[in-house]
Amino acid sequence: MSDINKIDMFKNDVRYRENIAHIETISAKKPSFKKIDNLNEDIISYLESKDVKLYKHQADTYEAIKNGENVIITTPTASGKTLAFNLPIMDTMIEDKNATALYIYPAKALSNDQLHVLENLENDLDIKITPRTYDGDTPRKDKKAIREKSRIVLTNPYQLHLILSWHHQWSKFYKNLRYIVIDESHYYKGVFGSNVAFLIKRLKRIANFYGSYPQFILSSATLANPRELANRLTGEDFYLVDEDTSPSGEKDFILYNPFHNYKRNKVNTQNAPSIHMETENIFMYLMLKNIQTLCFTVSRKTTELIAMWAKKDMTQVKGKLAHRIAAYRAGYQPQERREIENGLKSGKYLGVTCTNALELGINIGSLDAVIISGYPGTMISTWQQAGRAGRSNQKSLAILIAFENQLDQYFMNNPKFFFDKPHENAIIDLSNPILQEAHILCAAKELPLKRGEAEKYFSVSQNVLDRLVDNEDLNINHRGDFMYPYDDNPAMDHSLDQISSEEFKVMNNGNLLETMERSQVYREAHEGAILINKGDTYVVNSVNLSRGFVNVSKETVDYHTMVLNKTETNIKKKLSKTKFGDLTIHFGELTVSEDYFKYKKMHFSKPIGTYPLDLPPLKFNTKGLWFTIPKSVKDTLEDMFPNEEEVFAGGLHGAEHALIGLFPLHTMCDRFDIGGLSTNYHEDTQEATIFIYDGYEGGIGICEKAVDVFVELLNSTIDLLNNCSCKSGCPSCIYSPKCGNDNKPLHKNATKYILEYLSKMISNNNHGKKEEIIEEEIKNSNDDEFSDAYELYQKGDYSASKDVLNNILANDKKHAKALALMGKILYDQEQKDIALVFTKKALSADKSNELANELEVLLTSKSSMSSTFELNNLDDVDTLYEEAYDLYNQGDLSSSSEILEKLLDFDDKNSEALALMGLIYYHSGIFPKAIEYYKKASKINKNGEMVRELKMRVS
């Protein structure tokens, strides 16, 4: 039987055909070729020896690069992108014996794969380019030779981030740098992409310093905004090559919905089969038809499970095929991965389950079929994975198996959207202040930063530099240049994968299990949580928020945990408003407070217990969009559903969930990258309001892009609800897996009414008109909090008032009212020495503050304080320090740190105490904190005994 017939059999099999939501037959395509005039003779000979004719898009790429253009090429997988940019680079290498090129890949496996391609080109063209990879696995003994002799170096952003400050060792390479190649550039989005964009700007600055102005060559999967991405990533303008002229075989792309009959017949989907077991059934079916299949899954654990089940079942059915099944994922040894890759190419393996580790362009040859178990999060990933089948001209098969969530079910009901032109926008945000400051520090470490360079390379204003100087993070030298004044490398403190440098260590019996950010600790690793790592379950026993530790123990349990939280938002500043007909979408800066107050133990989907949490609120500043719903909508809904409670609130909540659920359709993000809040009444807007915000400190550009595509987002969301046949809401429409309110209240019909009301507002004329709002301060949330603190003070609740004041001062250290009130509380509590410290800080911030002036008179009068500064032994600074130092020497780091915290609360300029705290963090393995405390201590006194010892450790 031919492969075509075998593939067609699946579509008609009675076991599967009722769940097929759509079949898209993608026609075979013939190639289109183009000759290049004046092609280098060596390259002509090479192409003829390989019997290669250049496709038109390859020739177009070649010509654009040789004409000096920056080029981004966005043709599909297996269309010959690599050859398209390698040939002009080789041409330059032949012409200029000193020319160099830097290839940047997001993954080591890709670097190694492309290294072999370049080595073969070097041999076939008989030129000396000595291509080498330079990453964390490169032996130290080889690094010097690579820096001095290699003309093409392949690396990844993480390695480049760390070695840029050693650019003097690469001076010859940078002096002759002609090309920077960024492969798989669609990978650079969100936090990682924004960090890499700043990294590329640092790289450009160094190249310019050595006199080179390299061309950029980017390759990418198909995007809605390729030129915008390329420009954001590099700061350059680009020539786009997006016409695919390579041949391809016919492909059937099947959208497969295991929930199809359940939803059509309105049967509870809890009775539906396991998606993973359904995936394994289809995987087995194809292998038994001798169809070589690659099965993509959403997690490492699922990859292993499906391979294990398939091997077990195949042993029972056709034992000789069981050894031809394998799993492939990150975490395997390199030689294991190479063996599976080669086994796929040779046909040794008939079926392989994998994570997205095989999505990128690693060469595994041609396959007959691909199964995609669950939408992988982006259309780019989906088509990259589907492109693994049918690399030659034979017919192939791709099957997307839907999960029950909004995105997967939307595609099942809207195949035209799925197969239509690209909708996804890759987002890079260069306005995040935390990222700006982190990379400015790195740049100043690499080379003194001249006035004007911050704006030229990083689009950062002079105000940012002044703030860094005020904070003593930068110094100004005699030439007026900005310099990083410390011995450490700030790149070591800043991860490219996150915004915050704060890191928590998850420890199991003294061994490091993983690291995570504070927000992730609150969501996944709070006390009592079940943490899953590499398929094993761990119970969180304790969390130390001040020292950054999470202690867990490995236990086998039959439940998981789900945290609940209450969210509050305050509008800090409006930045713009966009009119869509009669609907106004606002965009601006928000302050978000998330209170994680309890968690539930869940056995599958059934709650088996609820437990309180005692965590301080998680507060952060971000950017988001919001819009209001008039009271008339509430009145109408209450008339429509007179006997139901919380109809309006349920509709707002459902609209928020549904919109967020489809954000990834239009902006390349994960739904967990964004948060939301809906409320019947918001103090800042005076109306019912829906907020949607970036879930990252400072914002990352997701909601800003969402404003531009809001009409498309709204229409998609309405389609989603209209095509979902459930009665009152389900995971396919308005339920959210991350809802902190336990998906309550929700009302599907009210949700539909609200969304359709918004659509009617938009249908009027003049939509899409954006107005910038210059520095409009809507509300200062600190002033509101101060009012709360003052009210608590008047009631005599000093402890609660101080908690609120501490929150204010964490955001604004110079909030004069908060400083003065803290001083007054301390004065009333007879802590007059510390009260004086806060009073002086308040007067420094605002000399006219009445309360601070009154306090100063009281605190400096002889009747209030004795002329000598007296403290009892417990509060005596020297005594406390000696006690902490003795405990440190005895190895009691925990007790020592507790005493130091008390001391530093009183005297935060004690350099020896700061350094001793840094040493405790160092010995605890929390190196970023150790470096942070060294910086604080060395700014005060570089020559202190403990400061010098800490410097020796952190250096």
Label every model-predicted segment.
Residues K11-S49, A59-D60, K66-T82, L87-P157, ...:
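Helicase motor core with emphasis on the C-terminal RecA-like subdomain
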Residues K395-A398, E404-F418, H439-R451, R467, ...:
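Extended Lys/Arg-rich polyanion-binding regions
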Residues D783, K817, E850-L851, D878, ...:
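Start-of-helix register in tetratricopeptide repeats
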Residues Q794, D828-Q829, L858-K862, N889-Q890, ...:
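Register position in tetratricopeptide repeats
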Residues L821, L855, L916, L950-R953:
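Canonical tetratricopeptide repeat
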